[in-house]
């Protein structure tokens, strides 16, 4: 699996950089690809666990939205408009298939390496840093919804307040429940050591 992760990263990273630019790597889902690849390569239960906390629910939601967009012609959530935009070549849009693979890959990684409970805290720290960095990207891109939320399309106060509220939304409503489920259903890394 290490070599598959390495090969995917070697293909995906330069093509994404060329097509979308460096700012695209501020997206939490792209950060997840990078950290998951490193986690698989280094056999790090901490990195895999943090990305299981951070990416599992988001990628499942992405898959539901992509399916709705492609099959039914309407979106469930904002952010996947590029999927049906013919301006971008189909092959580059198809590289986003990682969203479909990531949930299973992360669960496999947690099963194999164990769920490191520190992954929750690490993912909370990663997300805060990423949300802050996203504020320095183009407001029109609204990367990680750092400028306006995806539901009401508004900013929740000045930049620091909006970033904090966006981060708290993810920490409390996405990461914490995922952490509790992973903690409940998977052994710790010490129990999986051979």
Predicted feature residues:
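Short, hydrophobic transmembrane alpha-helix segments
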Residues: 13-22
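Hydrophobic/aromatic-rich structural module bridging two neighboring secondary-structure elements via a short loop
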Residues: 28, 33-79
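Hydrophobic cores of alpha-helical transmembrane segments in multi-pass inner/ER membrane proteins
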Residues: 32-41, 94-110, 166-181
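Alpha-helical transmembrane segments
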Residues: 1-12
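Central hydrophobic cores of alpha-helical transmembrane segments
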Residues: 50-58, 119-130
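Membrane-interface transmembrane-helix boundary segments in multi-pass integral membrane proteins
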Residues: 137-175
């Amino acid at each position: 699996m290490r070599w598959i992760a390495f090969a995917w990263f070697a293909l995906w990273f330069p093509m994404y950089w060329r097509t979308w630019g460096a700012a695209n790597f501020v997206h939490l889902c792209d950060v997840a690809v990078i950290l998951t690849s490193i986690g698989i390569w280094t056999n790090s239960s901490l990195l895999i666990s943090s990305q299981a906390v951070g990416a599992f629910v988001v990628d499942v939601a992405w898959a539901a939205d992509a399916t709705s967009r492609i099959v039914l012609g309407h979106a469930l959530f904002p952010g996947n408009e590029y999927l049906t935009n013919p301006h971008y070549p189909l092959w580059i849009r198809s590289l986003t298939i990682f969203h479909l693979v990531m949930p299973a890959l992360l669960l496999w990684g947690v099963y194999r390496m164990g769920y490191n409970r520190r992954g929750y805290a690490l993912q909370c720290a990663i997300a805060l840093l990423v949300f802050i960095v996203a504020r320095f990207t183009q407001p029109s891109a609204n990367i990680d919804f750092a400028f306006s939320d995806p539901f009401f399309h508004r900013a929740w106060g000045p930049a620091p307040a909006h970033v904090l509220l966006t981060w708290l939304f993810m920490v409390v409503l996405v990461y914490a429940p995922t952490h509790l489920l992973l903690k409940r259903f998977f052994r710790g890394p010490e129990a999986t050591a051979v």
